[in-house]
From Swiss-Prot:
UniProt entry keywords in alphabetical sequence: ATP-binding, Cytoplasm, DNA damage, DNA recombination, DNA repair, DNA-binding, Mitochondrion, Nucleotide-binding, Nucleus, Phosphoprotein
Region (Required for Holliday junction resolution activity) location: 1-117
Official protein name in the record: DNA repair protein RAD51 homolog 3
PANTHER family: DNA REPAIR PROTEIN RAD51 HOMOLOG 3 (PTHR46239:SF1), DNA REPAIR PROTEIN RAD51 HOMOLOG 3 RAD51C (PTHR46239)
Localization: Nucleus; Cytoplasm; Cytoplasm, Perinuclear region; Mitochondrion
Organism lineage: Eukaryota, Metazoa, Chordata, Craniata, Vertebrata
Family classification: Belongs to the RecA family. RAD51 subfamily.
SUPFAM superfamilies assigned to the protein according to its UniProt record, in alphabetical order: P-loop containing nucleoside triphosphate hydrolases
Region ranges (Disordered): 338-366
């Protein structure tokens, strides 16, 4: 199994530059001369030589030192995997229809991609989940914390405050109905201040900053073990506007996807990636498809596509290893992400939407 460069005891600066240049594993650099590595990565020849020496030495001993590095060769039986699936947690969305088609909510230990045009509700879902992941276990939550990586500047703390207050009020109503001591005690710590204190926000302005933050996450998570959700809101923007080299972009995206899968598995957390839609011309027809190409479509375990039909928002479960394709309506209210009002035209449909053939919808909302 190839060992990733992020697991070597290199300086953070060199580590980030290696990743940004497209070097992912030890095998990628071991055949490169110091002068070539220096030129391609943008480091001094001395740093390049030291890097190669460290990689060679560590490759011989093959003892990963990085927190969160996976242990090669660990095996599971099919029964253990089945039990793991049954015991994994879910982060509820407060839209029961969406939770149902996902099998219970956003699953832990998996990567979920949410695609859609601007204004359809991707960031709203991310902010909702950053609050919902903190719901106490006695209320059906996972009692975790959230990391929010923002590449587009769409995060609105005032909106998070509104969502958090609505969630607190909802749980108080439930506790009032049950009148259970456990519920009352759990709510003592579920305050607005605590909710905001456990959303860790990072603003990344380009792909270098994004890659740096992603590859430093294992160290951060080792010091914040309660994190159960990592969000990258706007995966496409840094790579669509800052990179002209398509082969380099593909390598960087593949490395980022593998890192997020590793984080989800090793730290038993959920990963949310939001992606924009782009126009594809097919047989003289303009179609909306997820950005970053077809190869990126295999990166996430689950793919949701949000879209408009007239003035109604819909979510289509387009890809899932365990659930069938389904489409449901939803709405975004002042209180947050919620079920749509039930009408004859907005009842749940299953397997009815092929998003690859969907023509451009109006980009409404904000």
């Amino acid at each position: 199994m190839q060992r990733e460069l992020v697991s070597f005891p290199l300086s953070p600066t060199v580590r980030v530059k290696l990743v940004a240049a497209g070097f992912q594993t030890a095998e990628d650099v071991l055949g490169v001369k110091p002068s070539e590595l220096s030129k391609e990565v943008g480091i001094s020849k001395e740093e390049a030589l030291e890097t190669l020496q460290i990689v060679r030495r560590e490759s011989l001993t093959d003892k990963p030192r990085c927190a969160g590095a996976s242990v090669a060769g660990k095996k599971y039986t099919a029964l253990e995997l089945l039990e793991q699936e049954h015991t994994q947690g879910f982060i509820i969305t407060f839209c029961s229809a969406l939770d149902n088609i996902l099998g219970g909510g956003i699953p832990l230990m998996k990567t979920t991609e949410v695609c859609g045009v601007p204004g359809v509700g991707k960031t709203q879902l991310c902010m909702q989940l950053a609050v919902d992941v903190q719901i106490p276990e006695c209320f059906g939550g996972v009692a975790g914390e959230a990391v929010f990586i923002d590449t587009e500047g769409s995060f609105m703390v005032d909106r998070v405050v509104t969502l958090a207050n609505a969630c607190i009020q909802h749980l108080h109503l439930i506790a009032g109905t049950h009148k259970d001591e456990e519920h009352q005690k759990a709510l003592e710590g579920f305050t607005l201040e605590n909710i905001l204190s456990h959303i860790y926000y990072f603003r990344c302005h380009d792909y270098t900053e994004l890659l740096a933050q992603v590859y430093l996450l294992p160290d951060f998570l080792s010091n914040h073990s309660k994190v159960q959700l990592v969000i990258i809101d706007g995966i496409a923007l840094p790579f669509r506007h800052d990179l002209d080299d398509l082969s380099l972009r593909t390598r960087l995206l593949n490395g980022l996807a593998q890192q997020m899968i590793s984080l989800a598995n090793n730290h038993r957390l959920a990963v949310i990636l939001t992606n924009q839609m782009t126009t594809k011309i097919d047989k003289n027809q303009a179609l909306l498809v997820p950005a970053l190409g077809e190869s990126w479509g295999h990166a996430a375990t689950i793919r949701l596509i949000f879209h408009w039909e007239q003035k109604q928002r819909f979510a289509t479960l387009y890809k899932s290893p365990s659930q069938k394709e389904s489409t449901i309506p939803f709405q975004i209210t002042p209180q947050g992400f919620r079920d749509a009002a039930v009408t004859a035209s907005s009842s749940q449909t299953e397997g009815s939407s092929n998003l690859r053939k969907r023509s451009r919808e109006p980009e409404e909302g904000c």
